[in-house]
Amino acid sequence: MYEIDDLVYTDAGVYWNAKGVKRFEEYIQMLKDGEFLITFQSSYLEKDYSKGDILKFTGHYNDDNVLMSLQLLSGIVIIKKNAEGMRFVEDWYELCHHHFNLISDKVSAVPCIRGFVENRHDQSALSLLAKQRRHIEISYKETLPLSLDWSQMEAFPIQARQYKKKKMQWKEKHIFELKKPYMALIAWYLKRYKHFYFSPTTKVYW
């Protein structure tokens, strides 16, 4: 990438809506107007999806304004390649690669905030680092309607709905079922000996 290029990142499977090109151009104009980081909200509170360790490390543990704000998505982000944008990416990389315990499912040494559900890994890192600096937040209403009525979303370019996966063939399904005891054993090992946790809704796959 060249200096001052714009990086638009979305997870594989995120739906791009061609009818939303006008709004997408508005996102890019925000960067031209001097912003360097455009983030997109999830519909969940930060305190519920970031464990105590990472909240303390990033200086947000006692900051109610951050704790009660909506967590930002790591699967949709727009960054300008300038000094500020590069610093943000470097900080994100540093935290994820050199402080892995902060983004892992290991039980937090620092007590989690009441209502905690689970840590969101690199997303918790991106969200909390973004909130340390100037950034734009696009409302979750532009990426995910709570009613799941996607017909409301024609004006918006980036939508957090996944393309449907191909239905598994009989052989693939059979192999997957046979692997379940192995996956359960690994999950038990991680919980028992590595002090990881998994919420009741977490699916553990390898």
Predicted segments, located by residue:
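Glycosyltransferase catalytic domains, chiefly GT-A lineage
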Residues: 1-206
